[in-house]
A protein has these predicted regions:
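Conserved nucleotide-sugar donor-binding catalytic segment
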Residues: 1-55
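Gram-positive cell-envelope targeting signals
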Residues: 13, 29, 34-35, 47-52, ...
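Catalytic core of nucleotide-sugar-dependent glycosyltransferases
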Residues: 37-46, 52-81, 95-128
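Amphipathic, non-membrane alpha-helical segments in soluble helical-bundle scaffolds
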Residues: 19, 56-61, 86-87
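All-alpha amphipathic helical-bundle segments outside canonical DNA-binding/catalytic cores
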Residues: 81-91
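Non-catalytic, well-ordered alpha-helical scaffold segments
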Residues: 23, 91-94
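Residue-level signal for well-ordered alpha-helical scaffold segments within enzymatic catalytic domains
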Residues: 4, 24, 69-72, 172
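Membrane-interface aromatic/basic loop that binds lipid-linked glycans or pyrophosphate carriers
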Residues: 105-178
Length: 178
């Protein structure tokens, strides 16, 4: 099926290429069974690609690819447009969107404050609304960041995000454990 449909890993994408490839594959098959349980465990550790950030442009491109492929896949299901939107944003798209936003304050961004605001303001409002509606954060800091993203409070988001990132770095430096 992969060779017949010439399904390839996306070129130039630094993160999520396996996810994008998977959705391209799903869009070519004719029968899919969806389960309510998650049988996929991501082993998150320091230094893994999943915990590293790339440029905003690279992260945003990954998000747009994910959104496009998920929308195409979910569009094949016999569900209402509202359910389609929920399925798209609850399954991986929200996480990928949050990475775009986080990369602007995660300590790897070389952009000045004005450029960061400009990039955030360039994202369509509907993305922020769908993210806020369907993303389910765990813990206070995630809930706070989600609130700031949903309501497009960019100045507070960049400030709060930077504080959280510096606090996490400080905890690692001193070897703080709970």
């Amino acid at each position: 099926l992969v060779m017949k449909n010439d399904i390839r890993f996306p070129v130039g994408v630094h993160y999520g290429e396996d996810m994008i490839h998977f959705f391209r594959y799903l869009n070519k098959i004719h029968r899919v069974v969806l389960l309510k349980s998650e049988n996929y465990l991501v082993n998150m550790r320091d230094g893994s690609l999943s915990t590293s950030y790339y440029s905003f442009e690279s992260e945003y491109e990954c998000f747009q690819n994910c959104l496009s492929e998920m929308t195409a896949f979910v569009g094949r299901l016999d569900v209402s447009p509202e359910e389609q939107t929920e399925l798209v944003w609850r399954n991986r798209t929200s996480d990928t969107f949050l990475r775009c936003v986080k990369c602007l304050y995660a300590g790897t961004s070389s952009y000045n404050y004005q450029k960061r605001l400009h990039l955030l303001r360039g994202i369509p409002k509907a993305y922020f609304l769908n993210f806020g509606r369907y993303f389910r954060p765990q813990g206070f800091s995630s809930k706070l960041i989600t609130f700031l993203v949903r309501h497009r409070l960019f100045t507070l988001l960049l400030l709060t995000g930077s504080v959280y990132e510096q606090h996490g770095t400080l905890k690692k430096l001193i070897g703080w454990r709970r």
